[in-house]
Structures are given as structure tokens and as C-alpha cells.
Amino acid sequence: MTDERLRKRAHGVDATLRVGKGGIESVVEELDSQLDDRELVKVKFLRAARGAGTTDELATDLAERADAEVVETRGNTATYH
């Protein structure tokens, strides 16, 4: 599926994971598990997590650790495929 189609489908998806003060290490396995069950997963980066960097930086780091692809970041939320 093209990136544009994935972004369109992501619009209606709710965030199912939240990254807070525990950092991204605490959600890597859960993101991987959810991606096994669904095509798209949205992750919201709470203020406590964003102290470690920008949303784009955190999203990229999480994608590398979970072997996922960042479809898009918007505000404090990232969508993975």
C-alpha cells in the first residue's frame, strides 16, 4: 500500500499506545505486538516523553527498535506500519 493511502487510512485510527515518563523502551514490545494484529498503530508521545527529544526523533527511534515504519508524525502522535 502506498504511503498516501496509509496516511489516509491512519486519519480514522485512534492512538492505542502512549509513551510517557517510562520512555519508548516500555512500549517497544507492545508496538510490535499490535503491528502483528493490525496494519496501522498510532502512538501518542506525552509531554514527559518529549523531554528527551522531538516527536520526530522519538518516533524514528521507536520505529528502529520495533522494526516498524513511520507512516507520518503529526503533532505529538506518530503512526506506524
PLM features per residue range, with description:
Residues M1-H81:
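Positively charged, polar, low-complexity stretches
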